[in-house]
Protein backbone atom coordinates (compact mmCIF):
# COMPACT_ATOMS: atom_id res chain seq x y z
CA UNK A 1 0.00 0.00 0.00
CA UNK A 2 2.92 2.38 0.59
CA UNK A 3 3.46 2.59 -3.17
CA UNK A 4 -0.01 3.97 -3.75
CA UNK A 5 -0.79 7.67 -3.53
CA UNK A 6 -3.13 9.17 -0.97
CA UNK A 7 -6.07 9.07 -3.35
CA UNK A 8 -5.86 5.38 -4.20
CA UNK A 9 -5.28 4.51 -0.53
CA UNK A 10 -8.45 6.36 0.35
CA UNK A 11 -10.41 4.59 -2.38
CA UNK A 12 -9.16 1.13 -1.48
CA UNK A 13 -9.81 1.67 2.24
CA UNK A 14 -13.49 2.27 1.50
CA UNK A 15 -13.93 -1.20 0.01
CA UNK A 16 -13.77 -4.64 1.54
CA UNK A 17 -11.61 -6.71 -0.77
CA UNK A 18 -12.44 -9.89 1.11
CA UNK A 19 -15.97 -9.80 -0.34
CA UNK A 20 -17.42 -10.04 -3.83
CA UNK A 21 -19.14 -7.12 -5.52
CA UNK A 22 -21.70 -6.83 -8.26
CA UNK A 23 -20.20 -6.41 -11.70
CA UNK A 24 -21.31 -2.78 -11.87
CA UNK A 25 -19.79 -2.03 -8.45
CA UNK A 26 -16.49 -3.65 -9.45
CA UNK A 27 -16.30 -1.55 -12.62
CA UNK A 28 -17.07 1.59 -10.63
CA UNK A 29 -14.23 0.83 -8.19
CA UNK A 30 -11.77 0.52 -11.07
CA UNK A 31 -12.97 3.74 -12.68
CA UNK A 32 -12.50 5.63 -9.39
CA UNK A 33 -8.83 4.68 -9.19
CA UNK A 34 -6.31 7.32 -10.31
CA UNK A 35 -5.64 7.53 -14.02
CA UNK A 36 -2.23 7.05 -15.59
CA UNK A 37 -0.78 8.41 -18.80
CA UNK A 38 -2.26 5.67 -20.98
CA UNK A 39 -5.70 4.17 -21.45
CA UNK A 40 -5.59 1.04 -19.32
CA UNK A 41 -6.99 -2.28 -20.48
CA UNK A 42 -9.73 -3.87 -18.40
CA UNK A 43 -9.04 -7.57 -17.90
CA UNK A 44 -11.02 -10.42 -16.42
CA UNK A 45 -9.71 -13.62 -14.88
CA UNK A 46 -12.24 -16.43 -14.54
CA UNK A 47 -11.61 -19.67 -12.68
CA UNK A 48 -13.78 -22.40 -14.18
CA UNK A 49 -15.00 -25.58 -12.50
CA UNK A 50 -13.45 -27.90 -15.07
CA UNK A 51 -10.66 -30.46 -15.21
CA UNK A 52 -8.60 -29.18 -18.17
CA UNK A 53 -6.49 -32.35 -18.11
CA UNK A 54 -9.49 -34.21 -19.50
CA UNK A 55 -10.06 -33.86 -23.23
CA UNK A 56 -13.82 -33.53 -22.79
CA UNK A 57 -13.44 -30.54 -20.45
CA UNK A 58 -11.18 -28.28 -22.48
CA UNK A 59 -12.63 -24.90 -23.36
CA UNK A 60 -11.74 -22.77 -26.34
CA UNK A 61 -13.86 -20.48 -28.46
CA UNK A 62 -14.51 -16.93 -29.52
CA UNK A 63 -16.99 -14.15 -28.88
CA UNK A 64 -17.71 -10.80 -30.49
CA UNK A 65 -17.65 -8.10 -27.83
CA UNK A 66 -20.57 -5.77 -28.66
CA UNK A 67 -18.53 -2.63 -27.96
CA UNK A 68 -15.15 -3.73 -29.27
CA UNK A 69 -11.87 -3.97 -27.38
CA UNK A 70 -10.56 -0.45 -27.92
CA UNK A 71 -7.34 -1.97 -29.22
CA UNK A 72 -5.91 -1.59 -32.71
CA UNK A 73 -4.87 -5.10 -33.70
CA UNK A 74 -1.97 -6.16 -35.87
CA UNK A 75 -3.53 -8.94 -37.95
CA UNK A 76 -1.45 -11.52 -39.79
CA UNK A 77 -2.93 -13.79 -42.46
CA UNK A 78 -1.36 -16.97 -43.79
CA UNK A 79 -2.65 -17.22 -47.36
CA UNK A 80 -1.50 -17.51 -50.95
CA UNK A 81 -2.76 -16.46 -54.37
CA UNK A 82 -6.17 -14.83 -54.55
CA UNK A 83 -6.78 -15.31 -50.84
CA UNK A 84 -3.61 -13.36 -50.08
CA UNK A 85 -4.85 -10.50 -52.25
CA UNK A 86 -8.25 -10.70 -50.55
CA UNK A 87 -6.59 -10.43 -47.13
CA UNK A 88 -4.59 -7.37 -48.18
CA UNK A 89 -7.71 -5.73 -49.58
CA UNK A 90 -9.50 -6.45 -46.28
CA UNK A 91 -6.83 -4.60 -44.33
CA UNK A 92 -4.56 -7.32 -42.94
CA UNK A 93 -1.27 -5.95 -41.66
CA UNK A 94 0.87 -8.91 -42.72
CA UNK A 95 0.06 -11.43 -45.45
CA UNK A 96 2.15 -14.30 -46.75
CA UNK A 97 2.71 -18.02 -46.80
CA UNK A 98 6.05 -19.83 -46.56
CA UNK A 99 7.88 -16.51 -46.15
CA UNK A 100 5.92 -15.70 -42.99
CA UNK A 101 6.38 -19.23 -41.67
CA UNK A 102 10.15 -18.89 -41.98
CA UNK A 103 10.12 -15.42 -40.45
CA UNK A 104 8.20 -16.66 -37.41
CA UNK A 105 10.52 -19.66 -37.08
CA UNK A 106 13.26 -17.07 -36.71
CA UNK A 107 11.53 -15.58 -33.68
CA UNK A 108 9.42 -12.77 -35.13
CA UNK A 109 5.99 -12.51 -33.49
CA UNK A 110 5.12 -8.81 -33.81
CA UNK A 111 1.38 -9.33 -34.36
CA UNK A 112 -1.69 -9.76 -32.16
CA UNK A 113 -3.74 -12.38 -33.99
CA UNK A 114 -3.25 -14.80 -36.88
CA UNK A 115 -5.72 -16.03 -39.49
CA UNK A 116 -5.03 -18.86 -41.94
CA UNK A 117 -6.73 -20.50 -44.89
CA UNK A 118 -7.16 -24.27 -44.36
CA UNK A 119 -4.60 -25.16 -47.04
CA UNK A 120 -1.92 -23.27 -45.09
CA UNK A 121 -2.37 -25.16 -41.83
CA UNK A 122 0.03 -27.96 -42.74
CA UNK A 123 2.88 -25.46 -42.68
CA UNK A 124 1.44 -23.23 -39.97
CA UNK A 125 1.09 -26.28 -37.73
CA UNK A 126 4.87 -26.51 -37.64
CA UNK A 127 4.88 -23.24 -35.69
CA UNK A 128 3.09 -24.75 -32.71
CA UNK A 129 5.99 -24.27 -30.30
CA UNK A 130 6.18 -20.58 -31.18
CA UNK A 131 2.51 -19.66 -31.63
CA UNK A 132 0.89 -22.04 -29.15
CA UNK A 133 2.27 -20.60 -25.89
CA UNK A 134 1.37 -17.10 -27.11
CA UNK A 135 -2.21 -18.08 -28.04
CA UNK A 136 -1.49 -17.03 -31.63
CA UNK A 137 -2.18 -20.34 -33.38
CA UNK A 138 -5.16 -20.12 -35.78
CA UNK A 139 -7.96 -22.57 -34.92
CA UNK A 140 -11.31 -23.47 -36.49
CA UNK A 141 -13.06 -23.05 -33.11
CA UNK A 142 -11.94 -19.44 -32.93
CA UNK A 143 -12.94 -18.84 -36.54
CA UNK A 144 -9.36 -18.03 -37.51
CA UNK A 145 -8.94 -20.97 -39.87
CA UNK A 146 -11.24 -20.07 -42.74
CA UNK A 147 -11.51 -19.43 -46.46
CA UNK A 148 -13.50 -16.27 -45.75
CA UNK A 149 -10.55 -14.14 -44.69
CA UNK A 150 -12.43 -10.90 -45.35
CA UNK A 151 -15.12 -11.82 -42.82
CA UNK A 152 -12.55 -13.01 -40.28
CA UNK A 153 -10.58 -9.76 -40.49
CA UNK A 154 -13.75 -7.64 -40.23
CA UNK A 155 -14.91 -9.54 -37.13
CA UNK A 156 -11.54 -9.14 -35.45
CA UNK A 157 -11.51 -5.40 -36.16
CA UNK A 158 -14.99 -5.09 -34.62
CA UNK A 159 -14.01 -6.79 -31.37
CA UNK A 160 -14.02 -10.56 -31.78
CA UNK A 161 -11.76 -12.17 -29.18
CA UNK A 162 -10.67 -15.71 -28.45
CA UNK A 163 -11.05 -17.30 -25.04
CA UNK A 164 -9.29 -20.37 -23.74
CA UNK A 165 -8.99 -22.08 -20.37
CA UNK A 166 -5.36 -22.66 -19.40
CA UNK A 167 -3.92 -25.69 -17.60
CA UNK A 168 -5.27 -24.41 -14.29
CA UNK A 169 -8.78 -23.96 -15.69
CA UNK A 170 -8.47 -20.18 -15.76
CA UNK A 171 -9.63 -18.00 -18.63
CA UNK A 172 -8.02 -14.55 -18.98
CA UNK A 173 -9.24 -11.93 -21.45
CA UNK A 174 -9.12 -8.23 -22.18
CA UNK A 175 -12.63 -6.81 -22.45
CA UNK A 176 -12.13 -3.13 -23.26
CA UNK A 177 -10.48 0.07 -22.08
CA UNK A 178 -10.93 1.85 -18.78
CA UNK A 179 -12.09 4.94 -20.70
CA UNK A 180 -15.15 3.00 -21.93
CA UNK A 181 -18.51 3.97 -20.46
CA UNK A 182 -19.32 1.74 -17.48
CA UNK A 183 -22.32 0.22 -19.27
CA UNK A 184 -20.24 -0.63 -22.35
CA UNK A 185 -17.72 -2.48 -20.22
CA UNK A 186 -20.53 -4.33 -18.45
CA UNK A 187 -22.06 -5.38 -21.77
CA UNK A 188 -18.70 -6.68 -23.02
CA UNK A 189 -18.10 -8.70 -19.86
CA UNK A 190 -21.62 -10.14 -19.93
CA UNK A 191 -21.11 -11.18 -23.56
CA UNK A 192 -17.93 -13.05 -22.62
CA UNK A 193 -19.64 -14.73 -19.65
CA UNK A 194 -22.55 -15.79 -21.83
CA UNK A 195 -20.16 -17.37 -24.34
CA UNK A 196 -18.28 -19.19 -21.57
CA UNK A 197 -21.51 -20.52 -20.08
CA UNK A 198 -22.64 -21.76 -23.50
CA UNK A 199 -19.26 -23.49 -23.88
CA UNK A 200 -19.63 -25.38 -20.58
CA UNK A 201 -18.67 -29.02 -21.20
CA UNK A 202 -21.41 -31.55 -20.35
CA UNK A 203 -18.82 -33.46 -18.31
CA UNK A 204 -18.16 -30.49 -16.02
CA UNK A 205 -19.90 -30.97 -12.68
CA UNK A 206 -20.52 -28.67 -9.74
CA UNK A 207 -20.01 -24.91 -9.69
CA UNK A 208 -18.92 -23.72 -13.13
CA UNK A 209 -17.90 -20.09 -12.52
CA UNK A 210 -15.77 -20.65 -9.43
CA UNK A 211 -14.32 -17.15 -9.17
CA UNK A 212 -14.30 -13.99 -11.24
CA UNK A 213 -11.92 -11.04 -10.93
CA UNK A 214 -11.94 -7.81 -12.92
CA UNK A 215 -8.93 -5.50 -12.96
CA UNK A 216 -7.24 -2.74 -14.93
CA UNK A 217 -3.62 -2.64 -16.05
CA UNK A 218 -2.47 -0.58 -13.05
CA UNK A 219 -5.47 -1.08 -10.79
CA UNK A 220 -6.52 -3.62 -8.14
CA UNK A 221 -8.27 -6.91 -8.79
CA UNK A 222 -11.92 -6.81 -7.71
CA UNK A 223 -13.82 -10.01 -6.96
CA UNK A 224 -17.22 -10.24 -8.65
CA UNK A 225 -20.21 -12.24 -7.40
CA UNK A 226 -20.42 -15.20 -9.79
CA UNK A 227 -24.10 -15.80 -8.98
CA UNK A 228 -24.98 -12.57 -10.74
CA UNK A 229 -22.93 -13.57 -13.77
CA UNK A 230 -24.54 -17.00 -14.03
CA UNK A 231 -27.97 -15.37 -13.93
CA UNK A 232 -27.21 -12.68 -16.52
UniProtKB/Swiss-Prot annotation:
InterPro entries: Ribosom_uL1_bac-type, Ribosomal_uL1, Ribosomal_uL1-like, Ribosomal_uL1/biogenesis, Ribosomal_uL1_3-a/b-sand, Ribosomal_uL1_CS. GO terms for cellular component: large ribosomal subunit. It comes from the Bacteria. One of its GO terms (biological process) is regulation of translation. Gene3D superfamilies: 3.30.190.20, 3.40.50.790. Keywords: Repressor, Ribonucleoprotein, Ribosomal protein, RNA-binding, rRNA-binding, Translation regulation, tRNA-binding. The keyword RNA-binding applies. Transmembrane segments: none annotated. One of its GO terms (molecular function) is tRNA binding. HAMAP family: Ribosomal_uL1_B. PANTHER family: 54S RIBOSOMAL PROTEIN L1, MITOCHONDRIAL, LARGE RIBOSOMAL SUBUNIT PROTEIN UL1M. Belongs to the universal ribosomal protein uL1 family. Part of the 50S ribosomal subunit. NCBIfam families: rplA_bact. Binds directly to 23S rRNA. The L1 stalk is quite mobile in the ribosome, and is involved in E site tRNA release. This is Large ribosomal subunit protein uL1. It comes from Chlamydia caviae (strain ATCC VR-813 / DSM 19441 / 03DC25 / GPIC).
Amino acid sequence: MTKHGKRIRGILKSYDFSKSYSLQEAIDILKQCPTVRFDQTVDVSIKLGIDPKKSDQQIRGSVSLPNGTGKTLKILVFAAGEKAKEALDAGADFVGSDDLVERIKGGWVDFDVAVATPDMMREVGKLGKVLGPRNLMPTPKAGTVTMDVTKAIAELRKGKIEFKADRAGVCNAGVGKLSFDRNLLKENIEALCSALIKAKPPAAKGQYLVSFTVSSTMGPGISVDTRELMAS
